[in-house]
Each structure stands twice: as structure tokens, then as C-alpha cells.
């Protein structure tokens, strides 16, 4: 099976890819399901809130059927996987957004799961690591999805007030309401190489300002250059770096 890297457009043979699903030519991390990332990222994992279900608050036509189909395909109840994880005996609270579940969009269940994750971490005095991947707020849930931005941010504020560490890893893509809220609230903000990070999409921006924008305007490398994030980390180095950050953060918090 062949595929083309979305970043460098190199034609890749699927067997060339390692477990990390990284382009060997440019280090771009292909979009992967949350459970795939979990398989190599942590040593142990206890899942939270796996039975939460959306109630389709706006009775959007076809929405419930789409959710049910994606739940069967991804083995997730919504667009984020949350739980308590460990790396080399370092316990922490972990959230991984899944770009294969309605493009990781932020709905009521996703917002509730992330809020509960921070509440658990605050109660148990744990750091939070959150991998973001999202197209933004979920249109099928309207204003209810937008309210999740404020709800999650409040839980983050309480976690921060307790003096606890919050690490964000921006993956491709991180856009819309997720970027405008909890994706940029971290104490430490990392990003994968060439990840798309922004608010509005390229086409929307160009149609609004009536001019073209630089091709790399919303790249992880460009936002690092302008000081919006702390570091770009290759996918295969994430576990080792997170272990060091969690250990350093736990010592500082003692």
C-alpha cells in the first residue's frame, strides 16, 4: 500500500512507516487514532468516562447515526481518550484527542471528559498531558460546543491554582476553538514537526483579507519562531521528553 506525505508529498510505502507513523523524509507525523498513539506512549493506562454519550442536543439530522458509526470504528465514545497513565512509574493524567473522530471536534462529551480529567488531576495532585488534534468546535452541537471552551478553561485555572503542571502537545491539526482555549493554556507547549496550528483555516483567512498568506504561516515551526510554543519534538522522542518533564515538574512541586 502506498500513501503520500501531506507535508513533503513524498510517495511512501506503508511498510516504510514505523509504529510512530512518521514520514522518513521530513519527520511529519501522520494523523493517527488516539489508541494508536497510546500504544507506544505510556507504560500503563486506566481509561476514564468511557460510557459518556452525547444526547444530540440540537437533534441534528443524521448526527446520532454518524456518532454511532464512529464509535464502532474507533472504539471511543467521542473525540478524546482520557485516563490515568504512567511513564517509568510517573503517574499523570492523560488526554489524547482523535483526529479520526469527526476531526477531533470539540463537543459536549469531549469537553466534559477533558474537564473531568483536570478535576481528577487537581484532586489527586497530578500533572496533565494533553495531545490536541482538532478542527474546532462541533457544529452539530452549536452553542453547547462553544461553551466547552470556557468550561475546560475554568478547570485548567483551578488545576493551575493548585500549583500543578499542564503540558500540551500540539499535533496536526490543532485549530478553531481548541486553539483559542485549552491548547494554548499549557505551562509547557510542545508541537510535532510541521503540525498545522491556527484558528481559522487558510482558505477562510484568504477570503477575508483578499490576499494570499505565507504557506508556512500556521506551521509549528513558524509559531515557534514567534514565541507561541516552547519546543518542537519528534514523535519518537515524545515519551522520553515527557518522562523528563514530569519528573522535573514533580520535584519542583514537592
Curated annotation (Swiss-Prot):
Cofactor binding remark: Binds 1 zinc ion per subunit.
Sequence intervals crossing the membrane: none
Main location: cytoplasm
Pathway where it operates: Lipid metabolism; malonyl-CoA biosynthesis; malonyl-CoA from acetyl-CoA: step 1/1
Example of a GO MF term: carboxyl- or carbamoyltransferase activity
InterPro entries: AcCoA_carboxyl_beta, Acetyl_CoA_COase_Trfase_b_su, ClpP/crotonase-like_dom_sf, COA_CT_N, Znf-ACC
CoA carboxyltransferase N-terminal domain residues: 1-254
Coiled-coil regions listed: none
Residue spans, zinc finger C4-type: 5-26
GO biological process, one term: fatty acid biosynthetic process
CC per GO annotation: acetyl-CoA carboxylase complex
Gene3D superfamilies the UniProt entry points to: 2-enoyl-CoA Hydratase, Chain A, domain 1
Residues holding Zn(2+): 5, 8, 23, 26
Disulfide bonds: none
Family: Belongs to the AccD/PCCB family.
PANTHER family on file: ACETYL-COENZYME A CARBOXYLASE CARBOXYL TRANSFERASE SUBUNIT BETA, CHLOROPLASTIC
HAMAP family, A to Z: AcetylCoA_CT_beta (MF_01395)
Assembly information from the UniProt record: Acetyl-CoA carboxylase is a heterohexamer composed of biotin carboxyl carrier protein (AccB), biotin carboxylase (AccC) and two subunits each of ACCase subunit alpha (AccA) and ACCase subunit beta (AccD).
Purpose: Component of the acetyl coenzyme A carboxylase (ACC) complex. Biotin carboxylase (BC) catalyzes the carboxylation of biotin on its carrier protein (BCCP) and then the CO(2) group is transferred by the transcarboxylase to acetyl-CoA to form malonyl-CoA.
Name under which the protein is recorded: Acetyl-coenzyme A carboxylase carboxyl transferase subunit beta
Amino acid at each position: 500500500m502506498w500513501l503520500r506525505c501531506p507535508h513533503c508529498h513524498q510517495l511512501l510505502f506503508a511498510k516504510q512507516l514505523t509504529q510512530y507513523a512518521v514520514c522518513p523524509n521530513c519527520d511529519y507525523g501522520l494523523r493517527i487514532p488516539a489508541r494508536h498513539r497510546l500504544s507506544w506512549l505510556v507504560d500503563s493506562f486506566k481509561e476514564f468516562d468511557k460510557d459518556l454519550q452525547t444526547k444530540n442536543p440540537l437533534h441534528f439530522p443524521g448526527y446520532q447515526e454518524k456518532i454511532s458509526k464512529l464509535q464502532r470504528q474507533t472504539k471511543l465514545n467521542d473525540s478524546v481518550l482520557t485516563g490515568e497513565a504512567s511513564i517509568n512509574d510517573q503517574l499523570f493524567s492523560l488526554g489524547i484527542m482523535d483526529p479520526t473522530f469527526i476531526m477531533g471536534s470539540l463537543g459536549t462529551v469531549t469537553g466534559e471528559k477533558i474537564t473531568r480529567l483536570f478535576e481528577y488531576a487537581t484532586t489527586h495532585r497530578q500533572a496533565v498531558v494533553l495531545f490536541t488534534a482538532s478542527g474546532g468546535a462541533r457544529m452539530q452541537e452549536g452553542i453547547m460546543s462553544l461553551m466547552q471552551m470556557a468550561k475546560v478553561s475554568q478547570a485548567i485555572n483551578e488545576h493551575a491554582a493548585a500549583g500543578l503542571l499542564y503540558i500540551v502537545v500540539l499535533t496536526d491539526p490543532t485549530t478553531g476553538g481548541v486553539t483559542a482555549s485549552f491548547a494554548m493554556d499549557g505551562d509547557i507547549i510542545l508541537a510535532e514537526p510541521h503540525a498545522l496550528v491556527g484558528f481559522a483555516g487558510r482558505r477562510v483567512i484568504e477570503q477575508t483579507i483578499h490576499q494570499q498568506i505565507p504557506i508556512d504561516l500556521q506551521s509549528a515551526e513558524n509559531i515557534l519562531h514567534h514565541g507561541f510554543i516552547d519546543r518542537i519534538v519528534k514523535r519518537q522522542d515524545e515519551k522520553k521528553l515527557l518522562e523528563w518533564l514530569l519528573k522535573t515538574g514533580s520535584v519542583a512541586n514537592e
